[in-house]
Amino acid sequence: QVASSDATNMELEITRDGDEYVLNGRKWWTTNAIGERCKIMLVMGRSNPDAPRHKQHSTVLVPRDTPGITLIRPLRVFDSFHSPGGEAEFVFENVRVPVSNMIKGEGCGFEIAQGRLGPGRFQYAMMFVGMAQRCLELMCERAEQRVAFGEKLSKKTSVQHEIARSRCD
């Protein structure tokens, strides 16, 4: 068992049993599931292993207090200002939810995940580019204001090189 950023690698099983789905397996990374406001989790798992790769998974709504959900450990997010933000590893053992908790239909889990993750990647990229631009602005302001050995830092070649390298990166 391994964690993976490939959404098609999820091993948690979602099996239909009459009017319910039964969930069994491990979720290595569950975002915000231990936050105090989390009452319902969106859980993606493999519901049809014989289907084409991108149609094997489904997503179901699972109330956080459903019997059979075990918190294994909280996880930290590297470089996050809000870490730990509620991310955790869970085990699901015979967790039962009504068939009506299926989102969009069986086999639509990957589509749902990509619909959220795709735009999210752009949002994070824009956020970090903005942060980098602000850091560059602050560096330039500081180099212009700070005087060392009778000269502004902005006049020193080594500082100019560092600013230029930062702009290129």
Question: Positions of the model-derived regions?
Answer:
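A gly/ser-rich beta-alpha-beta helix-loop segment of oxidoreductase catalytic cores
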Residues: 1-15
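Glycine-rich phosphate/pyrophosphate-binding beta-alpha loops
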Residues: 3, 28-35, 81, 119-124
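Short glycine/proline-enriched turns and hinge-like loops at secondary-structure junctions
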Residues: 5-8, 33-38, 53-56, 82-84, ...
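Buried hydrophobic positions in well-ordered alpha/beta secondary-structure cores of metabolic enzymes
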Residues: 14, 23-25, 60, 92, ...
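A generic structural signal for beta-strand entry/edge sites
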Residues: 18-22, 40, 87-89
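A short core secondary-structure module
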Residues: 26-72
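Glycine-rich beta->alpha junctions and the first turn(s) of the following alpha-helix
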Residues: 71-169
